A protein has these predicted regions:
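Conserved beta-strand/loop scaffold segments within soluble protein domains that form the structured core
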Residues: 162, 206-226, 233, 237-240
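Long, amphipathic alpha-helical stalk/connector segments used for oligomerization, subunit docking
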Residues: 295-348
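A helix-coil-helix interface module used to build multimeric assemblies
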Residues: 1-189, 195-196, 201-208, 217, ...
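A glycine-biased, small/acidic residue-tolerant capping/turn segment at secondary-structure junctions
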Residues: 47-50, 261-266, 337-348
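Generic, well-ordered alpha-helical scaffold segments in large soluble proteins
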Residues: 34-38, 84, 88, 131, ...
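Short amphipathic alpha-helical segments with heptad-repeat character
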Residues: 115-122, 126, 133, 163-166, ...
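Glycine-rich anion/phosphate-binding loop at the beta-strand->alpha-helix junction
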Residues: 172, 176, 190, 223-317
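Alpha-helical coiled-coil oligomerization motifs
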Residues: 133, 137-140, 181-184, 252, ...
Length: 348
């Protein structure tokens, strides 16, 4: 039974795959596999044992169903994953999860999810920037009334209005490119972040794992990745969604019957504006995306709360982050895509 609106109404399938249970499971296996690979690179695990781990550390062998069965007994998700891997690995199972702590796996897998999400968000933003640039060029000589305080001011062009939107969106692209190396980061220094379980080569092991996975290497961590990184990510999404909402709110206002200077496209042969008032042509996509932008911003506050952990870690962040990172990511992409759709079909 579908419960969350993301299940059936909002968000693209690519984001749902990244943040789904299967997406999480696949990336955690990838991280566990990279751990054993790094040990093998350092001469701690034989090539034969790594070959076994490489073969079994895939979702078709260590299934999500089997991990869930074990978790029902252990009540610990990563211990369940470790047991399922060791079970499948046979004699090579000794090197599964070697020297790691749970959050080495969890936070590094989240780093992979963030990395993959940033790729999709950047693509959606670049698409919107291109559409906005087309509007600015097309309407560069379209004179319209400028307004301040909601009152008539002096003339501007619609092209200037779109150019202002474009410049703001370009700044978001710069911010994302600057922030990405700080956001897509893992950690592998074990319990409380000392690396003691890995011995003298702990930092080299961490570097090998994270570079192999395409993630940034932190200078220092506790038992978890610093949540300031996640705050920056969610803030970027909230800021970007706000810029989209500003564009959409302007279009909604210009589509008012008493203004009627610009508005969403409307398929007069198929689309229905109202079940009662046949003349209605409502800016429904702009309204839809504006509402979603509010939800994206709502995840900023819990992201800050999640950063306040006891000592070297606690688990109060975990349940909240299953919502904040996944939902904000999927909805931000939805807002970007719908804003581009509105601009493509807009009449002026």
């Amino acid at each position: 039974m579908a419960f969350c609106p993301l299940d059936y109404r909002y968000g693209c399938q690519d984001f749902k795959r990244i943040w789904s249970e299967d997406g999480r499971h696949e990336r955690q296996l990838e991280v566990e596999r990279a751990l054993v690979w790094a040990h093998q690179q350092m001469g701690r695990v034989s090539a034969e044992d790594y070959a076994v781990i490489e073969k079994i550390a895939v979702p078709d062998v260590v299934t999500k169903q089997r991990v869930s069965e074990i978790e029902a007994e252990t009540r610990h998700d990563i211990m369940a994953l470790t047991k399922a891997m060791a079970e499948a690995a046979g004699d090579a199972g000794w090197c599964v999860h070697l020297g790691a702590t749970s959050n080495d796996i969890v936070d590094t897998a989240v780093g992979l999810q963030l990395r993959d999400s940033i790729v999709l968000l950047r693509k959606a933003l670049c698409d919107l920037i291109a559409v906005c640039a087309d509007v600015a060029e097309r309407e560069r000589d379209t004179v319209m009334l400028g307004r301040t305080h909601g009152q008539a001011a002096v003339p501007i062009t619609f092209g200037l209005k779109a150019a202002v939107w474009l410049d703001e969106l370009r700044r978001h692209l710069v911010r994302l490119d600057e922030a990405s190396p700080r956001i897509a980061v893992g950690k592998f220094l074990g319990a409380v972040g000392t690396g003691a379980a890995q011995g003298e080569g702990a930092r080299e092991l961490q570097r090998l794992i994270l570079e192999h996975l395409g993630l940034g290497v932190p200078l220092a961590t506790t038992q978890v990745v610093g949540r300031d990184r996640y705050i920056e990510y969610v803030h970027w999404m909230g800021n970007t969604a706000t810029s989209c909402q500003k564009v959409l709110t302007e279009i909604r206002n210009l589509q008012r019957s008493e203004i009627a200077e610009a508005g969403e496209g409307f398929d007069v042969k198929k689309q229905v504006g109202s079940s009662t008032m046949a003349h209605k042509k409502n800016p429904i996509t702009s309204e839809n995306a504006s509402g979603l932008a509010r939800i994206v911003r709502s995840f900023i506050a819990p992201s800050h709360e999640n950063a306040i952990l006891w000592h070297e870690r606690d688990l109060a962040n975990s349940s909240a982050e299953r919502f904040t990172l996944s939902h904000a990511s999927a909805l931000c992409e939805d807002v970007l895509a719908k804003t581009a759709k509105v601009l493509r079909g807009m009449w002026v």
